[in-house]
UniProtKB/Swiss-Prot annotation:
Its main location: membrane. Its cofactor is [4Fe-4S] cluster. The cyanobacterial PSI reaction center is composed of one copy each of PsaA,B,C,D,E,F,I,J,K,L,M and X, and forms trimeric complexes. Gene3D superfamilies: 3.30.70.20. This is Photosystem I iron-sulfur center. It catalyses: reduced [plastocyanin] + hnu + oxidized [2Fe-2S]-[ferredoxin] = oxidized [plastocyanin] + reduced [2Fe-2S]-[ferredoxin]. Keywords: 4Fe-4S, Electron transport, Iron, Iron-sulfur, Membrane, Metal-binding, Oxidoreductase, Photosynthesis, Photosystem I, Repeat, Thylakoid, Transport. PROSITE patterns: 4FE4S_FER_1, 4FE4S_FER_2. The gene is psaC.
Length: 81
């Protein structure tokens, strides 16, 4: 299944998505521009199975991490014309 994962700038650096991932494809990276000092990095999508547990774990009102499956990938990420 073709899918993509996007980390939005609303990430609060809480690590909930990283801990929720059963395949350990997400990681936090240092980022000086954020009050937590870290932010979720783009995952290894070749290992991601699209379970969306990271989305479910995200505590922000606007999901900071989104998994786009199949056709919604290009539309939802604003890549379709």
């Amino acid at each position: 299944m073709s899918h993509a994962v996007k980390i939005y700038d609303t990430c609060i650096g809480c690590t909930q998505c990283v801990r929720a991932c059963p395949l350990d494809v997400l990681e936090m990276v240092p980022w000086d521009g954020h009050k937590s000092g870290q932010i979720a990095a783009s995952p290894r999508t070749e290992d991601c199975v699209g379970c969306k547990r990271c989305e479910t774990a995200c505590p922000t009102d606007f999901l900071s991490i989104r998994v786009y499956l199949g056709d919604e990938t290009t539309r939802s990420m604003g890549l379709a014309y």
